[in-house]
C-alpha cells in the first residue's frame, strides 16, 4: 500500500470519521488562526466566494460563519468540499445546526476539483496538503480556481507531541516493537510541507505573490478518553507499516489496553493529556 493509499483509505472509513471529531481539539486550534491570517474578514472583495477545500467536518467553515459580519454573508457563497462522504455528512449537520448562510457541501477531489477557473476569492486548505495523494496537483488546482486577487490560506503541521506520546506507550510492550518517531510519521505524508522555505518556493514557482509562511505554536490539553480515541484512529493504520505480521498477531490486540494504562499512569486516571504543536500558516495571493 502506497503512502497515499494508506491516507486516503483511512479518511474513508466510518470508524475514522466517527472519531474525527476528537481531532478538532487539535486541528481546530488553528481554524481561527487560519481565518484571521487570511484577512477574509477585512477584505474589500465583494461578494466573497469561498471554498473550504478538504473541509473535514467543517472547522474552518464554522469559524468563518462566526467571524464574518452578517452583511458579508448576505452576498457570499461558501462551498465546503471534501472527498469523504462521511465527513460531508457531518459538515452538513453542522451547517444546519449552526445556521450557516449561503453554504453548501459538495464532493470535491482536491486534485481535480471540476470547479470553474478564476472563481473563488478565498480558498482554505486546513491540514490538507500533507495528506493529498499529489500535493502539487492540489496546489495547482487552488491556483487555477482562484480569481485574480484571490487568497490561498493553508495550514500544515511542522511538529507536534502526540506521536511521541503514542510511541512511549507502545514501547512499554515487551519485544522492542517499532513505532515511528515524529519525523518518520511526517515522512509518511507529503515531504516538504513542514518547511517554511519549501512551501514558499512551491507557491512562488506556481505564480503566487506576497507569500507568507508563519510558524504558530499552540498548546492545549484534552481528557485521556478523548486522546485515546485520537490514538485509536491513527494507530491501526500505522502498525501494518511498521510491524511484521507476526508482531501484529502477537501484540496488536494488547495495544488499546497498554495505551490506556500508559495514559492513566502518566497523567492520572482522570487526567488531561498536554498537547503541543507548531503549525505553518501560509497565505499567498494570485495576481
Curated annotation (Swiss-Prot):
Protein's cellular compartments: Cytoplasm
Record EC number: 2.1.1.9
Disulphide bonds in the chain: 55-80
Induction conditions: Induced by exogenous gliotoxin.
Top-level division of the source organism's lineage: Eukaryota
Reactions catalysed, as given in the entry: a thiol + S-adenosyl-L-methionine = a methyl thioether + S-adenosyl-L-homocysteine + H(+)
Cellular component, GO, one term: cytoplasm
SUPFAM superfamilies assigned to the protein according to its UniProt record, in alphabetical order: S-adenosyl-L-methionine-dependent methyltransferases (SSF53335)
GO molecular function annotation: methyltransferase activity
Record key words, sorted: Cytoplasm, Disulfide bond, Methyltransferase, S-adenosyl-L-methionine, Transferase
Main subcellular location: cytoplasm
GO biological process: methylation
Residues bound to S-adenosyl-L-methionine: 27, 54, 82, 87, 109-110, 126, 248
InterPro entries on file: SAM-dependent_MTases_sf
UniProt-listed CDD domains: AdoMet_MTases
Chloroplast found in the keyword field: no
PANTHER family, per the entry: METHYLTRANSFERASE
Family membership noted in the UniProt record: Belongs to the class I-like SAM-binding methyltransferase superfamily.
Role, per record: S-methyltransferase that catalyzes the irreversible conversion of the secondary metabolite gliotoxin to bis(methylthio)gliotoxin (BmGT). Gliotoxin, a member of the epipolythiodioxopiperazine (ETP) class of toxins, is characterized by a disulfide bridged cyclic dipeptide. Its thiol groups are essential for bioactivity, as they conjugate to sulfur-containing proteins, disturb the intracellular redox equilibrium, and generate reactive oxygen species by cycling between reduced and oxidized states.
Listed name of the protein: Gliotoxin thiomethyltransferase GtmA
Organism: Aspergillus fumigatus (strain ATCC MYA-4609 / CBS 101355 / FGSC A1100 / Af293)
Amino acid at each position: 500500500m502506497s503512502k497515499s493509499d494508506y491516507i486516503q483509505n483511512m479518511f474513508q472509513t466510518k470508524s475514522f470519521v466517527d472519531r474525527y471529531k476528537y481531532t478538532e481539539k487539535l486541528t481546530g486550534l488553528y481554524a481561527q488562526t487560519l481565518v484571521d491570517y487570511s484577512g477574509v474578514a477585512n477584505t474589500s472583495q465583494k461578494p466573497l466566494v469561498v471554498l473550504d477545500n478538504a473541509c473535514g467536518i467543517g472547522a474552518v467553515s464554522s469559524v468563518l460563519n462566526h467571524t464574518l459580519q452578517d452583511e458579508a454573508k448576505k452576498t457570499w457563497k461558501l462551498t465546503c468540499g471534501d472527498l469523504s462522504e462521511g465527513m460531508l455528512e457531518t459538515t452538513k449537520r453542522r451547517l444546519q445546526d449552526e445556521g450557516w448562510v449561503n453554504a453548501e457541501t459538495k464532493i470535491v477531489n482536491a486534485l481535480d476539483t471540476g470547479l470553474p477557473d478564476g472563481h473563488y476569492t478565498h480558498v482554505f486548505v486546513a491540514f490538507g496538503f500533507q495528506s493529498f495523494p499529489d500535493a502539487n496537483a492540489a496546489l495547482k488546482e487552488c491556483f487555477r480556481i482562484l480569481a485574480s486577487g484571490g487568497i490561498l490560506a493553508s495550514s500544515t503541521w511542522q511538529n507536534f507531541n502526540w506521536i511521541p506520546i503514542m510511541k512511549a506507550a507502545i514501547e512499554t510492550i515487551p519485544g522492542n516493537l517499532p513505532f515511528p518517531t515524529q519525523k518518520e510519521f511526517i515522512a509518511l505524508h507529503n515531504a516538504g510541507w513542514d518547511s517554511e522555505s519549501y512551501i514558499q518556493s512551491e507557491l512562488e514557482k506556481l505564480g503566487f505573490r506576497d507569500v507568507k509562511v508563519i510558524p504558530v505554536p499552540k498548546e492545549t490539553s484534552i481528557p485521556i478518553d478523548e486522546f485515546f480515541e485520537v490514538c485509536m484512529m491513527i494507530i491501526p493504520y500505522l502498525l501494518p507499516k511498521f510491524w511484521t505480521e507476526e508482531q501484529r498477531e502477537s501484540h496488536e490486540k494488547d495495544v488499546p489496553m497498554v495505551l490506556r494504562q500508559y495514559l492513566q499512569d502518566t497523567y492520572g486516571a482522570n487526567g488531561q493529556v498536554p498537547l503541543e504543536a507548531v503549525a505553518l500558516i501560509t497565505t499567498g495571493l494570485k495576481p
